[in-house]
Swiss-Prot record:
Monomer. GO terms for molecular function: ion channel inhibitor activity; sodium channel regulator activity; toxin activity. Residues 22-48 form a propeptide. This is Mu-theraphotoxin-Hhn2h. Disulfide bonds join 50-65, 57-70, 64-77. Residues 1-21 form the signal peptide. It comes from the Eukaryota. It is found in: Secreted. GO terms for cellular component: extracellular region; host cell presynaptic membrane. SUPFAM superfamilies: omega toxin-like. Lethal neurotoxin. Selectively blocks tetrodotoxin-sensitive voltage-gated sodium channels (Nav). Does not affect tetrodotoxin-resistant voltage-gated sodium channels or calcium channels. Expressed by the venom gland.
Length: 83
């Protein structure tokens, strides 16, 4: 009886996954999402004259974007807390 309940539940889960996948293909959601992500990355790379979070920097120079500061310990831009 436990095995039949497990198989029935597994079948319902499989049906749900297949239905969701076919609906997502119709909307082309994954491709659209990826294209938007890469478009945002390209935009940031062209427009930014300063370094953002996690970018390598030289302590003492003002290379990081506003609200970021160059960490002298790690030598990358991090969020500036004002302390």
């Amino acid at each position: 009886m436990k095995a039949s309940m497990f198989l029935a539940l597994a079948g319902l889960v499989l049906l749900f996954v297949v239905g969701y996948a076919s609906e997502s293909e119709e909307k082309e959601f994954p491709r659209e999402l990826l294209s938007k992500i890469f478009a945002v990355d390209d935009f940031k790379g062209e427009e930014r004259g300063c370094k953002g979070f996690g970018d390598s920097c030289t302590p003492g120079k003002n290379e990081c974007c506003p609200n970021y500061a160059c960490s002298s310990k790690h030598k990358w831009c991090k969020v500036y807390s004002g302390k």
